[in-house]
Amino acid sequence: MSIWSLWVLDLVGILCTSRIEKIIEEVKKRYEKALSHELSGAELEIIRETIEEVVGLDTKVLIPFVFHGRRLVISPVTRHQDIEQGEREYVEKVVKMLPILVWNSITCIYVPGDSDWTIDLMNEIFKTTSFEGFDPVTLYKRTRGKCGMRFTDVVMRTFRHNIGMLNRFGQRLAQEAGAKIQEISSSLSDEEKRKEEKMLQIIKEYGESLCTKEKQEEIIKAQEIVCDACTYIWRRPEDRASFLIEAYSRYLHSKTVEVSKHGDIDEPLFDYVDHCSLVSTYEKYKSMDIVGELFLRVFLEGKDINDESVNDTVCGVREREEAEKMRGEEERRKKEEESLRNALELLRMEEKEKSKGKGKKKKGGKKGSGEVTAKMEEEKKDSEEVEESAEAEVSLEEMAVGGARSKERSSKKKSRSKGHRYKVHKRVLRWTKSAERIKAELDEGSEEKWRNKSIEEIEEQKKVHDIIEVCVLLRSLDANRFFVSTNRYMKDGTERWKMVGVGIFEEGGEKKVGKVEVGLYRDKGEGSVIYHLMFKAMDTEKAGKGARSSFGKGDDVEGLEEGAGELSDMSGFEYPKGVRSEIVKGGDAFKIVYRNPKDTSEVLRSLTVLQKAEVL
């Protein structure tokens, strides 16, 4: 399913309506806000065609993670007794909503032009169904021996319980779609009648399929695979970190653009995955390594499940398994060599002790001299440890700006706790200049996508690229609390990777949730160089116009060697005279406030980098 289609389906839940003109207007508004330019007539026509053609069926799955503020309170493997006491009441409210959330996941259907009737039908079936005897909260709290249900177990029990309603829903859906085919207005043109009938026929057939055991089992199996995939991801720390950054940014985005239907309760996230493709991939490979990695890619990179994404995943997993096998063999070899070295060293020490014993018999030493020497050595060692401890107390502020050490500290040794070191590429520093100078450099540069941009476009791009103050955070000891590193890849003979954090960009009273992207590569001197730095709004990623996922491998930046001779370590960096920005550091946020240079009391915009979600 295309990224446009996913966005349209997302909007159905937000708008609580399905009039096509209203959806187009909402898409237009969000697209223009995200990309900071007006859509052309051709672009609007593409949107219209996409919305008119798409019919959203059997694509939704529930992601078994629950956030409360900046805390992750439920993971796939969380049991009720594992939940922090202060969060249990909130968690139980979320779990109580599972029946309606699961029902929405199973039956959410987007009908181009008018979905009101399907939404009304969905609500009617749910409200007239008795849930007597099924209480997900009681189920979750129940323990058998010392072990209770995991959150994914409760989710799946709820799915299986709700599947019983699908027969009634499917029958009514097919009946009403059939009736609407007979009622198609004669005032429509032949082409419009054809489109309307085709769409309703698809829905009628889908309703009939929902009554079949095969379709019901497919829905259950798809959600079960997602739950298992999320558990697989959760148990791999390197994957968990990236997954949580993406999930947390989606959670924050949903809070800024949607009004909660359940008051102060934040429901679990949903994603759009083709059920049939997911199930068939699992049936083909029977490997959670492959399916778990595939779902991770789909979730992080916004990809569809198709032959290309499946093949890429299979190759990636096999390469990783081979690398892990080679690494394991190398570690075993090193352990064997180390054991042999230790054995030889022990043998040499024993022989040395024997030779010392023989020497003492021939020549006696001065009484107590050995004890004095040992004491002196111990005092010297303690003195060195105190000196090293003092060295480690270099302040974060000094390290962030590359400042000199305090005079009281030794200048002969380097602090072990010094922050991260990064050089900054010319293409990043370019954005600190005026829009006119940036345009001149881009027009003469080798990057085709940046040529011939208007001054207005450059000024808008400058807002999200001129965030060089983020380097202060990147170089600090706190960087790992805000950013995760992605997998590394090779391009043009250089090793590249990204660091990604969650950010909120504010301007003119509007907030945009997104990610702070940092692109890095390893230079010939084995140093880390920042060649890409920007804030990317979630709406920009959803719009998909030339936008790449923050977690996707690869990029379109070439010719890094062009600016390699003009790298900077950003020590003591200052903006040109007259430009003002202020850094505000808090416990869980790093905020950059940009002010009007002519009137510093006026805030133009701000960027807040948020600490990673806390896992309870």
Curated annotation (Swiss-Prot):
It comes from the Eukaryota. InterPro entries: DUF3654, UPF0329. Residues 357-366, 410-422 have a biased composition (Basic residues). Coiled coil: none annotated. Residues 384-396 have a biased composition (Acidic residues). Residues 319-340, 347-356, 374-383 have a biased composition (Basic and acidic residues). Residues 319-422 are annotated as: Disordered. Belongs to the UPF0329 family. This is UPF0329 protein ECU10_1810.
